[in-house]
């Protein structure tokens, strides 16, 4: 292969690789479908029920703080409210589905919603403190986002409802190489792990029960083939750059 043909081959190689490593717009658009001015999608109602090893914040208060102080955990001093301090000061649901509250004792909470737990505790506490107010919050709502997102890691949400879109938003959204059609949701189950494949380009995802995340879920965003092609292009570029330099040196030596 003479010099002219060689350079032509190099040019065509880079041109072809660049074209095939480009990402079509259709691959990065969420919830694709026919464009409408307004669309209503009915969603499945999601209410989280407490599981073993969840962590709850339970606060029992009344106008007379001295009366209800005995019902609460002695708080560990902390200047900042963070997941670590809330873990220390929270109630961990044991494997039997119970939490152990001062004065009250063990109360079954597994299988109940936060509102139902609040009602149960109100009934117990108000037999002794008629004007008591009970606040129950879930503080172990954390999910892990991995793969092709801009800010992978563990993210916390202090709310009863946490959607896949909210989780991806907290992770900085998918990168340009995140495969919208290949989202893997890993959900811990008793005795194992449930794995579900989700497609962000499909509007029907909004109707799915998996649109709502649960504590300890792991979301993995797979890369597009274009990222692999890009990485291969970098390797090929380095190789051919070195090869081109070598050919030029050899031609220079031969011409002198």
Model-predicted regions and their roles:
Residues 1-20:
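Sec-dependent bacterial lipoprotein signal peptides
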Residues 2-4, 22-256:
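Ser/Thr/Pro/Gly-biased, low-complexity, turn-/loop-rich segments
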